[in-house]
């Protein structure tokens, strides 16, 4: 989101930038490849309390930042961890109605990450069991972001029609899930090297492969079939994300571009990944070209006002009939399952 945040202005820009930094902070803890999962869980659960309780934060934030010295990652991510107090200083200056949208989403993200870390087997590849678990994981790391953006947009658009609000509420989670599943699809090798497999074990088993056989590439044909099933589901979420975007007023060009840019790039990425064996052969990431990114950034502002032109443009990105036949997302089913996950009782002793 770093690129598209730049198109925003004013209070919304400040709030979304701050929330993005919070998400990067917890993501850095979750992604630390050398850090014991028990320590990750402790840091993540502690962060959720820091953002929920200002009084607790005043007394304990310095100690939390000190504990984060054990986290490994890129120099920029570790510097952000070190500057967590500055991010909270900016957060405290935001309007209360914006803070109220950020707190529950970031807290839920941290707790959800901790929950999945409690299942991590250090030193071996830990798979997700099925599509339902994949949806649950993606909700905590990205679906909550879609909900938060939706609620922040509502603060800026007090006169938005109830019809548009309902459309956005129904598709906000898919906005996040579509982008996250795109990342999962293109990062299979990198995630495997970190010890995680976000490709559900059930999908792999359906094709007659074990986890080890899938990751060894013993059958490229079956591996591509497995990837296609995930891309098909991803494309369904991206279609829902388009509905979310088109519900924004046509006059709110900046808000639309904020959604259009990552959505178009995700769809382009899915089209590149489609039937692409290079994804499963090399550690070098399969990604869209800089020229493609440039065309998206330069071309979409001219059509952002038109729902019809946006639909045509988006439809032209992925024209394969297999990927267009996506399963319907059971949002209510996901929400029902999420209610049964005991987030507040996750601890590092699990």
Task: State each model region's role.
Residues 273-350:
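Acidic, carboxylate-rich catalytic segments that either coordinate divalent cations
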Residues 235, 239-246, 250, 267, ...:
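Hydrophobic alpha-helix feature that most strongly marks membrane-spanning transmembrane helices
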Residues 253-264:
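Amphipathic alpha-helical protein-interaction segments enriched in hydrophobic
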Residues 67, 264-267, 308:
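Enriched - but not universal
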Residues 152, 182-188, 265-277:
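Extended, well-ordered alpha-helical segments in internal regulatory regions
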Residues 1-242, 246-249, 312-330, 336, ...:
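Acidic catalytic motifs of isoprenoid enzymes
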